[in-house]
């Protein structure tokens, strides 16, 4: 029986796991019921694990032959949004939804665990299963790393479902090199002097200053960085003023900066402060900038990606489903693992119409066997490669 056939065999199990998790979505660091469910399934399979604090868990399947450790990762948290669809297993928690597919990631990794548990004689080493909490706020991978999740690991693999791409369901994307950029956050506070809207000369309008700052920040990407290098500077929120006839004395903004370049990333705090402070001065205001570093860029290791690509070729039912490319300017905290070991991260098309983070988001469950089989085939192939070449 092929690995894909084994994945088809556990499809009812994976589907049931996914639907159970989907009904009870939990936010990052609050996935207590989800963690309990994962541990319950691991207990049923006889797979040892340890719980993370406060949520998540790490399990291990040891092969009959000794060797290196390869990690497979799934995120388990949900989003704070209402689900709007007619699924019989839709969210039972108003205001919470698995709108990014993490329920499917968790279920597919459980399915992979079920398959791998029957293949110990073919595992030349150990497969570590990481059920990671709190991806959405970028904190979960650090929790895993801080609690020893990367200790002894030689390589790590992850996968993510994506909808709304317009491509055929089940298309698997791989890419060597940069897949997702670093994602940092900034906060800007502008101080002016409030006054009556009919007498703007009597004050210092923080709203006008804030608007100028928003526009001037775009020159970082358009005039300070090569057009051949993708950079995004976005002001996502701007709050200023309390009434239609008052010139505001205060304005606050938040935003994000994204890049694949470590060198550029180091310069962004100073670039922002220079533009913000000088623009504020030009408008007779003052301003402060706070800058916070988030996820680093996710750069797929070429060697590990090639092993995963060949694994995908073996398991996909249709060769046209494997496509080179993909990626976006979105962020993914899987990137932290790349700072510890060589990693690769693949994406799977799960629906043509609805995007992730949408209240109508739906995953086509026919992709589950591919996701399960890709985990399994990669783990076995990587460990075999290491056993042969080291």
Please annotate each region the language model reported.
Residues 56-60, 187, 345:
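Conserved hydrophobic/aromatic beta-strand scaffold that supports enzyme active sites
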Residues 21, 59, 72, 102, ...:
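Divalent metal-coordination and catalytic microenvironments
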Residues 11-14, 35-39, 109, 207, ...:
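Hydrophobic face of alpha-helices
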């Amino acid at each position: 029986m092929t690995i894909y056939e084994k994945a088809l065999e556990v499809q009812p199990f994976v589907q049931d796991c996914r639907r159970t998790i989907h009904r009870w979505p939990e936010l990052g660091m609050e996935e207590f019921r989800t963690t309990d469910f994962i541990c319950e399934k691991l207990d049923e399979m006889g797979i040892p694990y340890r719980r993370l604090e406060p949520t998540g868990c790490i399990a291990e399947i040891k092969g009959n032959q000794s060797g290196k450790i390869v990690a497979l990762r799934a995120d388990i948290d949900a989003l704070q949004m209402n689900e709007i669809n007619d699924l019989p297993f839709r969210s039972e928690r108003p205001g919470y939804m698995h709108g990014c597919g993490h329920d499917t990631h968790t279920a597919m990794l459980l399915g992979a665990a079920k398959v791998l548990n029957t293949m110990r004689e073919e595992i030349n080493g150990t497969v570590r299963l990481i059920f990671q909490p709190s991806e959405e706020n970028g904190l979960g991978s650090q929790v895993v790393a801080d609690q020893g999740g990367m200790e002894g690991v030689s390589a790590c693999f992850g996968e993510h479902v994506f909808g709304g791409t317009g491509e055929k369901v089940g298309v698997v994307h791989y890419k060597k090199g940069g897949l997702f950029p670093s994602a940092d956050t900034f906060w800007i506070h502008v101080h002016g002097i409030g006054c009556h809207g009919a007498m703007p000369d009597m004050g210092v309008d923080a709203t006008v200053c804030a608007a100028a700052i928003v526009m001037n920040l775009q020159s970082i990407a358009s005039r300070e960085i090569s057009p051949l290098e993708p950079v995004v500077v976005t002001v996502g929120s701007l709050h200023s003023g309390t009434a239609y006839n008052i010139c505001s004395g205060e304005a606050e903004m938040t935003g994000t900066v994204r890049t694949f370049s470590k060198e550029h990333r180091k310069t962004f705090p100073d670039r922002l402060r220079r533009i913000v402070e000088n623009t504020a001065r030009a408008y007779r205001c003052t301003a402060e900038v706070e800058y916070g570093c988030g996820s680093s860029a996710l750069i797929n290791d070429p060697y590990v990606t090639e092993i995963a690509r060949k694994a995908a070729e073996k398991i996909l039912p249709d060769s046209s489903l494997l496509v080179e490319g993909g990626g976006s300017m979105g962020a993914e905290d899987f990137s932290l693992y790349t700072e510890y070991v060589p990693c690769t991260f693949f994406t799977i098309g799960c629906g043509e119409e609805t995007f992730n983070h949408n209240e109508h988001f739906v995953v086509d469950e026919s992709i589950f066997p591919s996701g399960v089989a890709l985990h399994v085939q990669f783990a076995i192939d990587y460990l075999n490669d290491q056993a042969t070449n080291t």
